[in-house]
């Protein structure tokens, strides 16, 4: 989304080219939501759309290429992290227990046909800040290299992602509870114990 639509509300219609390099990712989500809405509006099927934002926590697979399992696996294997671009891209992170509570609230009490953002809008942190937090947890320096985006990586990667969860707060009394630092610490400790380092 453009900067004026971040934090992003459920009502935001998107800013994606249907033939752009990210289309396979974004359009597949859009198709899923469209099908749910069609069944709701035409067939009376009770549906909701849940839009999760960067859910993380223990139990993620080491082969998952999202930032936390990817970084931790490389660190365990003593392999420098690869930071695409400047490292100033920002994201928010929602711990798994907070996400699951949000999902359940939507399933049980969501207004049929409505979409709900599930995430934790605070804090919005950069990739470099995340690395510093991991360093503090591990008690050691983490090596990393800033590299260009590979050709296989979709272009137009958003510089910021942050949900507006005011609708969920108002309608479903949803409040993320787990501080991101605590969540990252528990997650990294779990990864250290169970990851084999595949890199």
Name these PLM-found stretches.
Residues 30, 55-70, 79, 84, ...:
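Glycine/proline-rich active-site loop of Rossmann-fold NAD(P)-dependent oxidoreductases
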Residues 99, 103, 118, 130, ...:
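Non-catalytic, hydrophobic alpha-helical segments
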Residues 23-26, 63-66, 88-97, 125, ...:
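Residue-level signal for the nucleotide or nucleotide-sugar donor/cofactor binding architecture
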Residues 31, 35, 39, 71, ...:
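Hydrophobic alpha-helix immediately C-terminal to the catalytic Tyr-X-X-X-Lys motif of short-chain
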Residues 166, 180-199:
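Amphipathic terminal alpha-helices
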């Amino acid at each position: 989304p453009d900067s004026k639509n971040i934090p992003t509300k459920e009502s935001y219609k998107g800013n994606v080219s249907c033939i752009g390099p990210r289309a396979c990712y974004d359009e597949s989500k859009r198709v899923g939501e469209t099908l749910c809405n069609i069944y709701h509006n035409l067939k009376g099927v009770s549906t909701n759309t849940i839009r999760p934002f960067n859910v993380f926590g223990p139990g993620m697979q080491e082969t998952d290429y999202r930032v936390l399992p990817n970084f931790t696996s490389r660190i365990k294997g003593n392999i420098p992290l690869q930071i695409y671009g400047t490292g100033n891209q920002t994201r928010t992170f929602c711990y798994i227990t907070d996400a699951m509570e949000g999902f359940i609230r939507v399933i049980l009490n969501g207004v049929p046909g409505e979409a709900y953002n599930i995430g934790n809008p605070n804090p919005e942190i950069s990739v470099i800040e995340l690395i510093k937090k991991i360093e503090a947890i591990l008690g050691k320096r983490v090596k990393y290299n800033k590299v260009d985006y590979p050709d296989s990586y979709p272009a137009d990667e958003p510089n910021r992602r942050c949900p507006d969860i005011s609708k969920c707060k108002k309608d479903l009394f949803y409040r993320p509870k787990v501080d991101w630092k605590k969540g990252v610490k528990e997650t990294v400790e779990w990864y250290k114990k169970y990851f084999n380092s595949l890199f």
